[in-house]
Structure formats: structure tokens, C-alpha cells
């Protein structure tokens, strides 16, 4: 039962009128919470200014925050949700976090149907309030970017339903402790609690499972916010309307199995020597234009990588992810909301080429894969260790051999490929670059280096997935 701080007739909106609530909420756009209402009462009462969502409820809508399952505005069935966004270097917006919908009760979940599910009711009618996260500002000074009642398209809701059924099936199989964000596409079961060690009982196993909540993935929310992304869905042919995404992609790419990269380049008018060849080829095989992004992949945060197998099934290089800035890495405090965490908790699509007897790479197929829970934990350990080393100060260790630039080799104590054989850190630049404590410089620091907290700089780094993980996966799947 909602408890209002003032008599209902004194509220600045009509709590029994949906239009009145939405119009009142939309007055926040372009303003801050401090501009819009008295926030002092909340800060002194709650003693915690980190809960902006609760402050919106308490100060702006003037009701007591609660954890009840009923809608926040029960008279009209409207659910209030807040979500932070961040502005990227290209000025576009991306979701900083997933949009949490509701906590998961494993024991109750197995008795729900999709139509009666708690998560469907939470998505039924949402009032979404989005604010721009700027870490240098007080939370009450964040500007509100979007306020509205978004509707989820039917084609997306079909994917979300499949995701929900995937999660329920895992709980019914007694595998709630093995749930991973990579199991699903748009809807995920993310860890939720004081720490990842917060656990709950599950109905069909004695193994305690991490406490989780249903949430729309940050990749899905980014596709909603960033209207500059040109999304194009994979066209379905007659009879493919009910085909799942993975089966659809495998069928499309399967049409070209046996063709070499050179033949495929000729077929689609692509240059195999171009850096963008692999990405453009995947789009071409799926019938998506070169200038557009694959809608289903963008919304699901699917990471696509082209894998080149040698004749013996080995891969020459580890699998890289985008380079990171050390300042951005340290600004990430929660694993699941970190850039690397989002990747590890989403699906991968490996497009597989294998060298034939003529020494030419030919397409063998594609494989979807998500990291098992224990691998996600190992990747998290790498992320945490990297942050720890950077915070304490990266050690530069000079070696004996000299490089082409005339300076000795320089090792460091970031977690390398032998750290846990799952994920590691290594350079992500074609040329090395350093700035030392005495101000001396090696290489092009502005282009190839990232600044450390102590003012030194070192070659840009990125997280890498160990090639042995992918080699074993593909071997087990018959490549």
C-alpha cells in the first residue's frame, strides 16, 4: 500500500489519473531533481544521497519508497523505473546500467506462466525516467534526459518471452546456480544484492544460487536511447517467422559454408584485406546493409568475432576486446556494469573459417556461445586484479633484449595470459608507447598510450579471451 507524505488532495498530480502522473513526471526533462523539488528532507531523513530513484519517489512524487510488488502508482497500474545513461565521446547516449525490473524468487518463479509472470506485469506499463550520469556531480544535480512510457515492440517481446522461458527452464532443471547473462538475449537474470555472494534457495537443488533480478540488458536500453544507431533486422523469409535468432543466423551463414574468404569477398564486393572485411561479411551474409547495425545483435549485446582455425584446429591469436582507458576502468565499481562485464555476460557469435589443404581459409559455419558461470567468475577475477594493480601502481620491469626503437623490452605486472587461462590483459596497439616518472618518453604517447593515475603512461591495453577456451569449444563442436 502506497504511503503518501501529504494528503492525496495536496499532491502536485492526480494519483488516480495516468495522464496527470505522466505529465507531472515530464516536467523533469532538462532539469535536475534539486531544481525540481526540496531534496534536503530526503538527504537528512535517509542519510544516503546515492539512491536517486528513491529520492525521486520521496521528494518529487511525495510517497514513501517501498519494495512492494504492486505498481508504484497502483490506482492506474503504472510502474516507476529510473535508469542512468552516459554520454560517449561521439556525443551519443548509451545506457550505463541494465534496467532492473523485479527480484527473482526461484521457488515462486517455477509456478508462474508467462501470462501471469511478475516480470510481464512490471513491463506492462512503465514510467521511465532517465538521467545523465556525470560522476563529478552530486546525484541531485544530474539532468533528466528522457521521461515517458515506452512500449516494447511485439517482435522484441517475443524474444523477451523466450529469454524468460530459458531462465525458468534452468531453474526447473535445478541449475539456478549456473545462470549466466549470456544465456539470454534481451532479458537477463542479473546478480542483485549486497555482493555476488548473496544467495537464495532454489527449488530443485540443494545448491544455493546467487540472488538475481530480472532486467532488460544495457545493450537493449542503449538501442532504445541512441536514435542515431541505424538498426536493420535480419529479414525473414516465408516459413521463418517463428524461427529463433540462433537458428536463423546459422541457416543464413550455413548457405555459404565451403566458400573461401576470397570467393565471399568477390560475391559481396568486399576486399578481404580490409580491416572491416569480417564485420561487413557477417552483415552481408545476414542480408544487412553495410552502413547499418544488426538490430538483433545490438539489442542483445552479441559480440561477433571471426575465428581463423589452422589445419590442426589451433588459433594463432587470443581474442581481443576494445582497448580501455585506465581512468575509465577505475571509474567502474560494479563488475556487471563494467564494459568487460557486459561482454562476458552476453552472447558471442563465432564465425569460423578453417585453412584448407591449399592454405586458403574457407567458411565452416558459426557458433553461438555464452561463458559458463565459472568462466564469468574467472573473467571477473581478471578485471578486479587489473583494477587493483592500476590503483596501486603498475610496475614497469625492463628486460634485457632491445626493441627496434632502441629501448629495452618493458614487462608489467598486469594479469597476463598465465593468470587464469580464461581472460588476461595485454597491449592493444600496433606500436608501444611509454611515459616514465622522470618525464622521458618512448613512442607516440598521444596516439598509442593511456595515462596511469600517477601521471605515467603505458601502451594502451585491453582484455583478451584466451584462445585455448575457443579452441576447445570449437573442437568439442566438431570443427
Give the residues covered by each predicted segment:
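Nucleic-acid endonuclease domains
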Residues: 1-479
Amino acid at each position: 500500500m502506497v504511503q503518501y507524505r501529504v494528503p492525496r488532495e495536496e499532491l502536485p498530480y492526480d494519483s488516480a489519473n495516468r495522464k496527470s502522473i505522466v505529465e507531472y513526471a515530464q516536467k523533469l526533462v532538462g532539469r535536475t531533481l534539486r531544481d525540481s523539488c526540496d531534496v534536503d528532507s530526503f538527504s537528512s531523513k535517509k542519510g544516503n544521497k546515492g539512491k536517486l530513484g528513491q529520492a525521486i519517489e520521496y521528494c518529487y512524487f511525495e510517497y514513501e519508497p517501498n519494495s512492494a510488488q504492486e505498481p508504484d502508482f497502483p490506482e492506474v497500474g503504472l510502474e516507476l523505473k529510473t535508469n542512468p545513461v552516459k554520454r560517449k565521446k561521439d556525443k551519443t547516449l548509451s545506457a550505463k546500467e541494465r534496467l532492473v525490473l523485479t527480484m527473482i524468487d526461484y521457488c515462486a518463479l517455477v509456478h508462474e506462466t508467462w501470462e501471469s509472470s511478475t516480470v510481464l506485469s512490471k513491463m506492462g506499463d512503465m514510467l521511465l525516467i532517465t538521467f545523465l550520469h556525470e560522476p563529478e556531480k552530486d546525484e541531485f544535480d544530474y539532468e533528466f534526459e528522457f521521461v515517458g512510457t515506452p512500449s516494447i515492440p511485439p517482435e522484441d517481446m517475443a524474444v523477451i518471452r523466450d529469454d524468460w522461458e530459458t531462465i525458468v527452464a534452468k531453474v526447473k532443471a535445478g541449475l539456478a546456480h549456473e545462470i549466466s547473462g549470456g544465456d539470454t538475449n534481451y532479458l537477463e537474470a542479473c546478480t542483485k544484492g549486497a555482493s555476488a555472494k548473496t544467495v537464495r534457495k532454489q527449488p530443485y537443488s540443494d545448491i544455493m544460487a546467487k540472488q538475481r533480478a530480472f532486467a532488460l540488458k544495457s545493450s537493449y536500453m542503449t538501442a532504445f536511447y541512441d536514435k542515431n544507431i541505424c538498426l536493420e533486422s535480419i529479414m525473414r523469409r516465408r516459413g521463418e517467422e517463428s524461427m529463433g535468432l540462433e537458428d536463423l543466423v546459422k541457416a543464413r551463414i550455413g548457405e555459404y559454408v565451403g566458400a573461401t574468404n576470397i570467393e565471399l569477398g568477390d560475391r559481396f564486393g568486399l576486399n578481404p584485406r580490409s580491416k572491416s572485411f569480417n564485420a561487413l561479411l557477417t552483415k552481408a551474409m545476414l542480408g544487412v546493409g553495410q552502413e547499418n547495425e544488426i538490430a538483433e545483435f545490438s539489442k542483445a549485446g552479441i559480440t561477433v568475432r571471426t575465428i581463423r582455425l589452422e589445419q590442426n584446429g589451433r588459433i594463432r591469436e587470443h581474442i581481443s576486446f576494445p582497448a580501455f582507458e585506465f581512468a575509465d576502468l577505475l571509474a567502474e565499481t560494479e563488475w556487471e556494469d563494467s564494459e568487460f562485464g557486459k561482454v562476458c555476460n552476453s552472447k558471442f557469435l563465432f564465425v569460423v573459417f578453417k585453412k584448407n589443404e591449399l592454405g586458403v581459409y574457407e567458411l565452416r559455419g558459426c557458433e553461438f556461445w555464452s561463458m559458463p558461470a565459472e568462466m564469468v567468475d574467472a573473467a571477473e577475477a581478471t578485471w578486479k586484479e587489473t583494477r587493483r594493480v592500476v590503483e596501486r601502481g603498475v610496475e614497469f620491469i625492463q628486460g634485457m633484449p632491445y626493441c627496434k626503437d632502441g629501448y629495452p623490452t618493458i614487462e608489467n605486472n598486469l594479469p597476463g595470459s598465465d593468470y587464469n587461462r580464461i581472460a588476461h590483459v595485454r597491449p592493444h596497439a600496433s606500436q608501444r608507447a611509454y611515459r616514465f616518472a622522470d618525464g622521458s618518453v618512448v613512442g607516440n604517447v598521444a596516439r598509442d598510450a593511456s595515462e596511469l593515475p600517477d601521471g605515467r603512461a603505458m601502451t594502451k591495453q585491453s582484455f583478451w579471451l584466451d584462445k585455448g577456451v575457443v579452441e576447445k569449444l570449437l573442437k568439442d563442436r566438431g570443427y
